[in-house]
Amino acid sequence: ICDVAEDLTKSCDLIFENNRVLNNRARGMLVAAKGKIRIKDNYFNTTGAAILFESDGKKWYESGGTSDVVISENVFDNCLYGNSENWGSSVIDMKPREKFDGEHYYHSKVEIINNKFYDNKKPLLYADNAKEVVFSENVIENQVGKSAIYQNCGKFICSDNKADEKIINL
């Protein structure tokens, strides 16, 4: 059958604050917890995705979806500068392996607010299979290509972002 069970009574909260994430092969950090997740005041400069939401219950057995994530006041500086697509396709990469069934979302709520994105050559956000995603009040400089890609999201709010000194809504 290959079903995987996760004990949600043992889920932890995560506070990842005031860190420098650089010179790391692959991704900066892997997010996989059902509790409250707060990622704040960090500096990311990574060869792959700065933040990867993984959801593998078939190969790596890392974890299930997330429920309450706030990513705020971070600096994402030239992330995804490596050449491997295996390390992510966006700075914040949220692509569960579990496909959207049309009714149930894999991730619940993810807020990406008041961050700074500098010199990123790939999309800043790829969001898939999430009930609610908020991308607001971020500063974006020297972005090449699309800033956000989203699909199968119940609600996607994108507002009051500033790109190269202009207010934009992606």
Where on the chain are the PLM-derived regions?
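Extracellular parallel beta-helix/beta-solenoid repeat domains
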Residues: 1-170
